[in-house]
Amino acid sequence: NGERAPGSKKAPSGFLGTR
């Protein structure tokens, strides 16, 4: 989760990419 999510742009991969 969070590899290419909208949250992963700022946070590292898998940090808060679920949002």
Curated annotation (Swiss-Prot):
Keywords: Amidation, Neuropeptide, Secreted
Keyword Secreted: yes
One biological process term in Gene Ontology: neuropeptide signaling pathway
Tissue: Midgut.
Recorded superkingdom: Eukaryota
A cellular-component GO term for this protein: extracellular region
Annotated positions of the Arginine amide modification: R19
Localization terms from the record: Secreted
Primary location recorded for the protein, binned into one broad class: secreted
Function as written in the Swiss-Prot or TrEMBL entry: Myoactive peptide. Increases the amplitude and frequency of spontaneous contractions and tonus of hindgut muscle.
Protein name: Tachykinin-related peptide 3
The organism of origin for this protein: Rhyparobia maderae
Organism lineage string: Eukaryota, Metazoa, Ecdysozoa, Arthropoda, Hexapoda
